[in-house]
Amino acid sequence: YLSYSYVSSSLNKKVYIDERERLLLYALPDRVVQAAEGTALSDVTDLENTEGKTAPVWYEQDGTCYVSVTFVSHFTDQSFQFFEAPGRLYIDDSEGTRRQAQILEDTQVRRLGGIKSEIVTDVTAGAQVEILDSMDEWSQVRTENGFIGYVRNDTLSGETVTEYTSDFVEPEYTSLTKDYDICLVWHQVFSSDDNNDLSSLLEEARGVNTIAPTWFSLSDNEGNFTSLADTSYVETAHERGLEVWGLIDNFNKDVSTYEVLSRTSTRTALVENLTQAALDCGLDGINVDFESLTADVGPHFVQFIRELSV
């Protein structure tokens, strides 16, 4: 297992844990993989070769969340190798150039470059090592069984350079692009009557091809929002060749954006209801205008955007 903080910061930013509702989530292009705390690896249908594996996908101990390497490796383009005695895990890039050499004689791998440095492990003549870095008299190497340390350069021979390619299949996260420059205006809509002003306002606008009416606004901490959406407004805009991106804001001071986005239940409600509202009136897109976000909201906002994009 690896700490969640390490996984999300160094290996795969899409691994997300909702510590309030005890869920691990992973957003794929067409769905969100979900595992409650204690869920066995074998119960996650998106994982392969996990039959009979009852170990949990993730757990929390002493305030730290840990995620199964099996789960992480399934979604991450990295090489993971386990070794025993002592137990250790070696993580490396799946592709790239690697320098390798053969050990000429029995020697020691040392913690630092120097004969007085602590011995990490012994290596025998003929063993293969990967060269990680080279100095004048010593080189940093990784042994076949995953130890990293330094050996003298005169104990190395037959250096080769090998190009490795990854067989990892990255999910395709698609996005919408336009083959023209977007000229967008916002339409401040305070009441449903303001929607009737679209035609007259467009008479004064030149070169505009996208309009974002301020229709949606968070109304409580449960993921609900007010709506001034109007199907006829969208139809009028489309007749004039404009796309309509409905705007949602977080300007209500009685609403905590953190409370809404940090819980999967409320975030899901917001995503589902907002998507349905967009479909109901034929919107071309959604303009998320969440402002004054604090650092603690950041990861949850990113997850919200991931889920909204599914």
Q: What are these model-predicted stretches?
A:
Residues 1-135, 157, 165-173, 177:
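Primary recognition of N-terminal secretory signal peptides and signal-anchoring hydrophobic helices
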Residues 30, 144-146:
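Glycine-centered tight beta-turn/hairpin loop motif at sheet-sheet or coil-to-beta transitions
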Residues 106-108, 147, 152-199:
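Boundary/entry segment of secreted carbohydrate-active catalytic domains
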Residues 109-112, 140, 191-198, 218-222:
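Short, solvent-exposed loop/turn elements at domain surfaces
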Residues 126, 138-143, 151:
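SH3/SH3-like beta-barrel fold
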